[in-house]
Amino acid sequence: MTLLLVSLLLASLLQISSGNKANKHKPWIEAEYQGIVMENDNTVLLNPPLFALDKDAPLRYAGEICGFRLHGSGVPFEAVILDKATGEGLIRAKEPVDCEAQKEHTFTIQAYDCGEGPDGTNTKKSHKATVHVRVNDVNEFAPVFVERLYRAAVTEGKLYDRILRVEAIDGDCSPQYSQICYYEILTPNTPFLIDNDGNIENTEKLQYSGEKLYKFTVTAYDCGKKRAADDAEVEIQVKPTCKPSWQGWNKRIEYAPGAGSLALFPGIRLETCDEPLWNIQATIELQTSHVAKGCDRDNYSERALRKLCGAATGEVDLLPMPGPNANWTAGLSVHYSQDSSLIYWFNGTQAVQVPLGGPAGLGSGPQDGFSDHFTLSFWMKHSVTPSKGKKEEETIVCNTVQNEDGYSHYSLTVHGCRIAFLYWPLLESARPVKFLWKLEQVCDDEWHHYALNLEFPTVTLYTDGISFDPALIHDNGLIHPPRREPALMIGACWTEEKNKEKKGGENSTDTASGDPLLIHHYFHGYLAGFSVRSGRLESREVIECLYACREGLDYRDFESLGKGMKVHVNPSQSLLTLEGDDVETFNHALQHVAYMNTLRFATPGVRPLRLTTAVKCFSEESCVSIPEVEGYVVVLQPDAPQILLSGTAHFARPAVDFEGPEGVPLFPDLQITCSISHQVEAKADESWQGTVTDTRMSDEIVHNLDGCEISLVGDDLDPERESLLLDMASLQQRGLELTNTSAYLTIAGVETITVYEEILRQARYQLRHGAALYARKFRLSCSEMNGRYSSNEFIVEVNVLHSMNRVAHPSHVLSSQQFLHRGHQPPPEMAGHSLASSHRNSMVPSAATLIIVVCVGFLVLMVILGLVRIHSLHRRVSGTGGPSGASTDPKDPDLFWDDSALTIIVNPMESYQNQQTCVAGVAGGQQEEEDSSDSEAADSPSSDERRIIESPPHRY
């Protein structure tokens, strides 16, 4: 029985074991799942629910679901099995999910059974199903405004659909909570309204006379009705009625010389009052006609400037100063410009005929240089005469020249705003050629310089240093040839016919041969600096250096010039035009218009400035008009250069040195320095509220002088006894001019400080042999910039030492002279300050006179020594309270002598006549008084001061 039960049990176990090994089917799950998980939660709600089925059920292990596996990169979820028998499962988040980080998650899931036994052998897996999990948002974020403060401006009297828009954003991820549903104005009683999009408009017309600035608070709500944590502030400014105009410019613009280019309108902008424009044109005009001749140019004289610019010499002045040698300009009206240059006025009925011989330097014979190579240079101020209009020509110069081949002729005329040059190479055979230029400078009634270079067949006209090519060149066969006779006329021209009878409206002028010339085409305007030079022509660089304007309008920002912008500057740089179609681009371009003055020492003063604007609008009916802008540039006073002359102010030399062939140098160690004082503002201390100024001296590297003068302090030089010497060869080599008179010596011409130092150190003072001169004072002064800046007055005192042993004397006389010389010889440190005697009489070279002088000198010495000693003793006795019986009257020299050592050397000349000695003594006493008075007058500080103040002006 027992065996039977055991057998049955084993059979059943074998049957069960045989059944578990039959895991024939894989688990099954849905193909796709949709899941939802709430933000900040971890449970996922799936649709359909997560169940896995296995056809091996109800077998143990093979029919059970042991778990789920998730596949995907970085899946923040996990799957758990709730019931192995039913295959129910659950998906949950490993940690709370964030919707703002990721709204949706997609991954795959797979189920697996328990296999064929507890060890999980022969496990089978289901297919992979796709799971989509959406994270549901929670309204955790409040709206946030993009700006904390919003500003806008409105014009009074208008209703705006939108003044400005405020904007808030929400950090939530869902459309429900991330969208702003509406805005609200929290401040009550404001004339503004805000819509759901944040647009603010005014509900009534605002007035500038009322509230000028409105401030109110705005908040925002999302669609979950959550309010913004921080509200926004809004400021709306009310402006007066808009007037189209230029804004942000200064009427006064200060320019410091040497500042380079200075922007005139750095902050300017065009207010169009919202009127759309399609074209803008602005003209900036700088008025410089009142500065010298039309604009600021180099301040040097014409002669100095020609040397600085390297211009060739040999020009002939055709309109010189009226004088005995230049009487042809005597009948013209003469004026002077601000730079003291000579100006001639031609009134339309006057002309001058320049003589071909004599001072003009033109000669009456053949003039080869004027045939086809010459430069004509002049200043002209001309406008269209109302009575003449633009119909009649006006002749500037008319010239017929005789050369080897015959006669040539040229004339320069103006006709309205045209200037024409007619050239006839050869009257006998060639035909005339006419060159025409149309220039606004010809008729603008302003000063301009013209230089015409003729190198036939090439003709170039320079106006203010800028070259212009002819606009038209043509042959003119209708012109009748002029009479074949040399003649040069300025201000008019003669007709071609030779007739002694005057015609109506024509004047006659006699020629050199006595035949009259019928004159017509008179010039009406101003001329100055009219010169001609034959042969070598002036180069473009030289002409530009001589006559170009050094100030004007400037524009250099072409790289950032916007699209469609145009910039035009006239040749004289006094007019600049801008044209464009975009307001912002136009503003940017106008902000870079600048004023420039390249002169280191610019002419100070005011330059008026005008900005004129013309605009074109899309709507002609409502097109705006921009008013004119007027201002001025103030060129400040430049830092004046300080020219300092220094050196030895006193020296003494023996007379033999002055009588040498080269004399004695007056300024052997002269030093000339030039510096500029700059006023700079130092950084003020925190405890000091004022401004601290400091003066800094900075030496300039390059400086020129244009003249120096050596003059006499006191009487003029006596040409028979003294003279000033200077090396003429050295001056001529450097192109300097010398004027040497008995009152002064001047050096004129532009040169560097080093050259002037070298030349002035060579200036020497020479005396004739035997001239009894003892002292002289010389005054030296220099200047630059045509005398605009002057140096200090450097005074040198020269003492001439005369020796008494220049002729033979007895030994006892010589010893007396030596004693006298020792008695009056000053110590070495006072050698340059010895008193000068103004004794002008010649010394009598006789032994008797020498003896008389020695005696008189000895007597004077004794008197002086006695007076000094008595005065000293009187002071000592008075100070110590001497005996009552002692007399202290200093007027009595014979009262007493002290017992100090006194050595007296007497010259025993008692055998000589006492009468002569007495006479000589009286004469010597008178002479001493005169010398004393003259010496005091010469060395009086008030006298020197008076002479310095009354010193004559520069003569160079």
Swiss-Prot record:
One GO-annotated biological process of the protein: synaptic transmission, glutamatergic
CDD domains xref list: Cadherin_repeat
GO molecular function: calcium ion binding; cell-cell adhesion mediator activity; enzyme inhibitor activity; neurexin family protein binding
Post-translational modification: Proteolytically processed under normal cellular conditions. A primary zeta-cleavage generates a large extracellular (soluble) N-terminal domain (sAlc) and a short C-terminal transmembrane fragment (CTF1). A secondary cleavage catalyzed by gamma-secretase within the transmembrane domain releases the beta-Alc-beta chain in the extracellular milieu and produces an intracellular fragment (AlcICD). This processing is strongly suppressed in the tripartite complex formed with APBA2 and APP, which seems to prevent the association with gamma-secretase.
Membrane topology: Single-pass type I membrane protein
Keywords linked to the UniProt accession: Calcium, Cell adhesion, Cell membrane, Cell projection, Endoplasmic reticulum, Glycoprotein, Golgi apparatus, Lipid droplet, Membrane, Postsynaptic cell membrane, Repeat, Signal, Synapse, Transmembrane, Transmembrane helix, Ubl conjugation
Side Extracellular, residues: 20-847
Xref: Pfam families: CLSTN_C
UniProt key word Phosphoprotein: no
Example of a GO cellular component annotation carried by this entry: endoplasmic reticulum membrane
Signal peptide: 1-19
Taxonomy, superkingdom: Eukaryota
Residue spans crossing the bilayer: 848-868
Cytoplasmic side: 869-956
InterPro entries in alphabetical order: Cadherin-like_dom, Cadherin-like_sf, CLSTN_C, ConA-like_dom_sf
Region: Disordered, residue numbers: 916-956
Consequence of gene loss (knockout): Mice are defective in both excitatory and inhibitory synapse development. Mice also show reduced body mass and increased energy expenditure. Mice also display reduced marrow volume and cortical bone mass without alteration of trabecular bone microarchitecture. Conditional deletion in neurons leads to a significant reduction in number of excitatory synaptic inputs. Conditional deletion in the cerebellum causes major impairments in motor learning due to a large decrease in inhibitory synapse, associated with a robust increase in excitatory parallel-fiber synapses in Purkinje cells.
Entry function: Postsynaptic adhesion molecule that binds to presynaptic neurexins to mediate both excitatory and inhibitory synapse formation. Promotes synapse development by acting as a cell adhesion molecule at the postsynaptic membrane, which associates with both neurexin-alpha and neurexin-beta proteins at the presynaptic membrane. Regulates the balance between excitatory and inhibitory synapses by inhibiting formation of excitatory parallel-fiber synapses and promoting formation of inhibitory synapses in the same neuron.
Subunit text: Interacts (via cadherin domains) with both alpha and beta isoforms of neurexins (NRXN1, NRXN2 and NRXN3). Directly interacts with APBA2. Forms a tripartite complex with APBA2 and APP. Interacts with low affinity with KLC1. Interacts with SLC23A2/SVCT2.
Protein name (Swiss-Prot/TrEMBL): Calsyntenin-3
Organism this protein belongs to: Mus musculus
Gene: Clstn3
